[in-house]
């Protein structure tokens, strides 16, 4: 029965055989494509370049085109596009001309969720980790969920998987307001912060109203799981007319964490729930922000009847998500080693949470930080916040802003950030021009016992493996043996 479920297209889309993804290598697209492949659909897709993601999809049977051309979409029954793709794309133009439906990725995700028990995780920060934790705990409880995540689960080696149960767990993306397509049975809001404000015409009240609208997509018998520690979530809560469970460190939260203790990568805490005995748990991730992500998971797992034993097991064996405080290894330096960490954080709130986690888990160590701002608009809008939070590193190297398709904005660049941080008088940042080899710059700055954090959402994601493979550090490793 399970095999038939995986092999046959779902009845709600029985007229659709071939699905074409424009930008199939994107993190939001590839997971949906993989699930559809496993459901038996013919999947094709185009992207600007080959990548491990496109190679993986090709190995599953997807037809991959490099470059965007009209003929790529000619045989498709439907096109799936991200918000970054517009009607000038030749594949989209062809589809519109031939009256082939063109749908946003979130609408396709909504179709996958339509006849399943959908769990959607929204919020400015923590979506990927929380979604991944829920999938891990559900798997430990024997529920075998389908999941679509915005990052690669280290244990599964993928960001999507077709399960055999009725559960579908997915991220709900507020960046383009596309999460309004989703109609889950359970919805999480981890927090609400000022980001992607162009989508909301620079109006924070509009952003808040959109989150309320998202929660009202729940049926009257659904469940909203929200973080009471977040002041904006607390503010909108009276407007939410759906059953609600709150979580956090706050004393008035329904589900609370107490007795938090961090030892390096390991975080221990006790969970208090209504009408339940206290539950002692641990997660292999540092920081209070990951305690909150775990609490959201515990709320949902408890509501769905997952046993406490499975909750404890699923959290404790969780191996993390790619680029979320991912420890790449140890870099050899004179007198010892440096712990090399890669992280996706690109908003001041995320940067602050990671720095706090480092200080909590390794209080005696220096933090050497290589940071790459993501988008000129974000750098401009949150400039003062970036200055304040980045100044908390012991050593700071600032790469030039990753544009993500944006044109430069005067005064919103890394050189200006360096100057502003320097003027505070507590740190002298080093500006790194685009394309510079960082290994010979970083190595003299490192001391045994340091933590080297590479952080940002742009191409800095390739820096940690490059440093690990650098002949400079390989030579040092040879000397230390």
Curated annotation (Swiss-Prot):
Enzyme class per UniProt = ligase
Reaction equations catalysed: UDP-N-acetyl-alpha-D-muramate + L-alanine + ATP = UDP-N-acetyl-alpha-D-muramoyl-L-alanine + ADP + phosphate + H(+)
The UniProt record lists the EC number as 6.3.2.8
Its localization reads: Cytoplasm
Main location per UniProt?
cytoplasm
Kindly list the GO CC terms recorded for this protein. Answer: cytoplasm
Q: What does this protein do?
A: Cell wall formation.
Q: Which family does it belong to?
A: Belongs to the MurCDEF family.
Q: What is this protein called?
A: UDP-N-acetylmuramate--L-alanine ligase
Q: What is the lineage of its organism?
A: Bacteria, Pseudomonadati, Pseudomonadota, Gammaproteobacteria, Pseudomonadales
């Amino acid at each position: 029965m399970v095999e038939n479920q995986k092999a046959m297209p779902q009845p709600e889309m029985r007229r659709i055989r071939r699905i074409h993804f424009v930008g199939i290598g994107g993190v939001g697209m590839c997971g949906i494509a993989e699930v559809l492949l496993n459901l038996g659909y013919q999947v094709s897709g185009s992207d600007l370049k080959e990548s491990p993601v496109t190679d993986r999809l090709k190995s599953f049977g997807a037809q991959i085109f490099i470059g965007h051309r009209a003929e790529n979409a000619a045989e498709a029954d439907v096109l799936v596009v991200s918000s970054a793709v517009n009607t000038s794309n030749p594949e989209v133009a062809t589809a519109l001309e031939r009256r082939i439906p063109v749908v946003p990725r979130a609408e396709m995700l909504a179709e996958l969720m339509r006849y399943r028990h959908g769990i959607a995780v929204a919020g400015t920060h923590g979506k990927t980790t929380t979604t991944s934790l829920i999938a891990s705990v559900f798997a430990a409880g024997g529920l075998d969920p389908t999941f679509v995540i915005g990052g690669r689960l280290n244990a599964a080696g993928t960001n999507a998987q077709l399960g055999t149960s009725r559960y579908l767990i997915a991220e709900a993306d507020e960046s383009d307001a596309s999460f309004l397509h989703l109609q889950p049975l359970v919805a999480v809001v981890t927090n609400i912060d000022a980001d992607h404000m162009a989508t909301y015409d620079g109006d924070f009240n509009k952003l808040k109203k959109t989150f309320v609208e998202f929660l009202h997509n729940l049926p009257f018998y659904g469940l909203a799981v929200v973080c009471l520690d977040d002041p904006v979530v607390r503010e909108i809560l009276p407007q939410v007319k759906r059953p609600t469970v709150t979580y956090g460190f706050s004393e008035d939260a329904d589900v609370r964490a107490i007795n938090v203790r961090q030892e390096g990568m390991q975080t221990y805490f006790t969970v208090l729930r209504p009408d339940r005995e206290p539950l002692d748990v641990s997660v292999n991730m540092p920081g209070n922000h990951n305690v909150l992500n775990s609490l959201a998971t515990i709320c949902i797992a408890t509501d769905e009847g997952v046993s406490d034993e499975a909750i404890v097991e699923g959290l404790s064996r969780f191996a993390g998500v790619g680029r979320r405080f991912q420890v790449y290894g140890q870099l050899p330096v004179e007198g010892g080693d440096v712990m090399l960490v890669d992280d996706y954080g690109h908003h001041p709130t995320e940067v602050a949470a990671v720095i706090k986690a480092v200080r909590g888990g390794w209080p005696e160590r220096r933090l050497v930080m290589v940071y790459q701002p993501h988008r000129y608009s974000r750098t401009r809008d949150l400039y003062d916040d970036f200055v304040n939070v980045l100044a908390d590193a012991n050593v700071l190297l600032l790469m030039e802003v990753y544009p993500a398709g944006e044109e430069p904005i005067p005064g919103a660049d890394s050189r200006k950030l360096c100057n502003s941080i320097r003027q505070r008088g507590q740190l002298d940042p080093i500006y790194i021009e685009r394309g510079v080899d960082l290994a010979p710059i970083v190595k003299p700055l490192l001391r045994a016992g340091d933590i080297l954090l590479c952080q940002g959402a742009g191409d800095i994601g390739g820096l940690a493996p490059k440093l690990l493979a650098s002949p400079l550090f390989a030579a040092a490793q040879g000397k230390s043996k």
